[in-house]
Amino acid sequence: MLCREPRLYSCQRLKEAAKRQGHEMDILDPNRCLLKLSQNPPHFQIFYQENSGSKPYLLPDYDAVLPRFGTTSTQMGCSVLQHFEGKGTFCLNSSQAFLNARDKWKSLQLLLKTGVPVPNSFLSGGEVQAQATIPHISSPTILKMLNGSQGIGVILAEKPQSAVSIMEAFKQTNISMLQQDFIEEAGNADIRCFVIGDQVVATMQRIGQDGEFRANCHRGGKTEKIILSDDEKQIAIRATKAIGLDVAGVDLIRSKNGLLVLEVNASPGLEMIEKTSGVDIAAEIIDYIEINAFINLR
């Protein structure tokens, strides 16, 4: 497992599930990996340094790799994943799918291209004056940093001029922001689906604190059980496939025009959705790896 914080709930649950099913799992920090490319075989080698004073050693051949790195490690994490892919190792998820999911704008493009419904969204180039975007801004509107996570970098602007002021401020630090229609009828609630392969294995509704439009659990929101229709589940599965992921956390919102996909997460947390749904998602992931890594080895 590629993970920078092995003590996190999700990493511990996955390691425990693997052990219960008779597997050994190493947890590797992608930022401690050394990657080597060579014209002569073996073409792809990965070395690992346990700590700053130790000598890097050659990693063994693994049957499967499970990436669980955060947004700050996306570049190196995906480089390590690509190296494992070069070695022919089964990776859940692929490096390209990870990159697709971590780019908020690209993921929206991929979703809409494959017919998955998303909120009306807008992105302007760095040389476009923020004032010129006013005709395209809904009121109120949501502003999102392109690489934010856990609700960080998501801002509600009540009026178009407020949105312009916020964008101008962020532009000074070379941070681009996308705009999305605010789905007022959803209140401060959204839905998280956990998709593995062709199945939605768990769901939960997230509800933000009073006065907080973001429903993320990291922002103090609460969760409760929710049942989705088969059509709603299919939207979550289609969204996962559109990004190229095998395992994903898909965030949905119910609007007056139907269900919309807000985001597709490549490394979704397990804690709140396991505790809310009662589903052993960690075991489901290990089961999926067992089946697909075996096919990959044949």
UniProtKB/Swiss-Prot annotation:
Q: Which terms does the record give in the GO molecular function aspect?
A: ATP binding; metal ion binding; ribosomal S6-glutamic acid ligase activity
The coiled-coil regions, if any, are none
User: Which of this chain's residues are annotated to bind ATP?
Assistant: K144, D181, F182, D190, R214, A215, N216
Q: Does the keyword Nucleotide-binding apply?
A: yes
User: SUPFAM superfamilies from the entry?
Assistant: Glutathione synthetase ATP-binding domain-like (SSF56059)
PANTHER family per the UniProt record, alphabetical? RIBOSOMAL PROTEIN BS6--L-GLUTAMATE LIGASE, RIBOSOMAL PROTEIN S6 MODIFICATION PROTEIN
In terms of NCBIfam families, this protein maps to:
rimK_fam
Protein family (similarity comment): Belongs to the RimK family.
Q: What is this protein called?
A: Probable alpha-L-glutamate ligase
- This protein's species is Haemophilus influenzae (strain PittEE)
Q: Which gene encodes it?
A: rimK
